[in-house]
Regions:
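Amide-forming acyltransferase catalytic core, primarily the GNAT-like/NAT-type
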Residues: 26, 31, 128-214
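Conserved beta-strand in the GNAT
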Residues: 50, 56-65, 73-75, 80, ...
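Conserved beta-strand-loop-alpha-helix junction that forms the acyl-donor binding cleft
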Residues: 82, 111-121, 140-142
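Conserved active-site alpha-helix within GNAT-family acetyltransferase domains
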Residues: 88, 92, 104, 116-134
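Conserved small/polar residues in nucleotide/adenosyl-binding loops
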Residues: 229-236
């Protein structure tokens, strides 16, 4: 078994390994979706690593590189082990192998997310010294099941496309800092995939949202504090 970077590994090889590693996962990605995910999350193959059994990938960690809260950061875009290699500690070996390379690249912190019910992964990360800093809720619903009940009076407003980064006040709308994949840096890596809309009352920005029409993913939605939050949010 040899651990090395994914710099010389083609996408199709990576996609096959990803598909096998996550075959029993809640969400399945096709090739186009995986490519889009890697782009958005800042995947860097030179700082991503895999354990190879001959020519076959046995386990891997795909790292995104960027900044988070002002600190150069590596983000675990995906760690997976093929079923026949599970229980061998490969994920831990890959992580330990990667750390000197990440430090030399100037990375100051490592960030990851894990499903809470994936207790095996949680245990691995805790044993590596990771601590939980916050928890996310994830909501998903089919478009056909979303109903506008019309019980909220509409506002006198205008809705138009915006560039959120040009509004210095937007971060003051937030109740929390967006996650890595929903940050402006990540959105900017795939800017053509997103639409940003602002809700204006008397030409003042009262709320905004950033979403990906192809997937229905709402990356950010926030309203100005002390505004009529429910109605502005609903307009978004």
């Amino acid at each position: 078994m040899e651990i090395k970077s994914l710099e010389k590994t083609d996408f199709n090889t990576l996609f096959r390994a990803f598909g096998r590693a996550f075959a029993d996962y809640e969400v399945q990605l096709n090739a186009e979706q995986l490519r889009a995910m890697l782009t958005r999350r800042g995947f860097d193959p030179t700082l991503s690593f895999a354990a190879f059994d001959g020519a076959q990938i046995a386990a891997f960690t795909l790292n995104g590189i960027g900044n988070f809260n002002g600190v150069p950061t590596a983000y675990d875009t995906g760690t997976g082990t093929l079923k026949e290699y599970r229980g061998t500690g490969l994920a831990t070996e890959i992580f330990r192998h990667s750390m000197p390379h990440l430090r030399r690249a100037g990375v100051g912190q490592y960030l990851l997310e894990v499903l809470q019910h994936n207790t095996g992964a949680v245990s691995v990360y805790r044993n590596l010294g990771f601590e939980t800093v916050r928890e996310f809720n994830y909501f998903c619903r089919a478009n056909t099941e979303i109903v506008d009940r019309g019980d909220t009076p509409r506002l006198p407003h205008s809705v138009r496309r915006i560039d959120p980064e040009k509004f210095a006040s937007i971060s003051s709308f937030w109740d929390f800092t967006p996650s890595w994949q929903n940050s402006f840096e990540s959105i900017g890596r795939a800017a053509g995939d997103f639409v940003s809309l602002g809700v204006f009352t008397e030409e003042e920005l009262a709320g905004y949202c950033v979403f990906e029409p192809a997937s229905g993913d709402v990356a950010q939605i926030a309203v100005k504090r002390r505004s009529e939050e429910r109605r502005v949010g609903k307009e978004c």
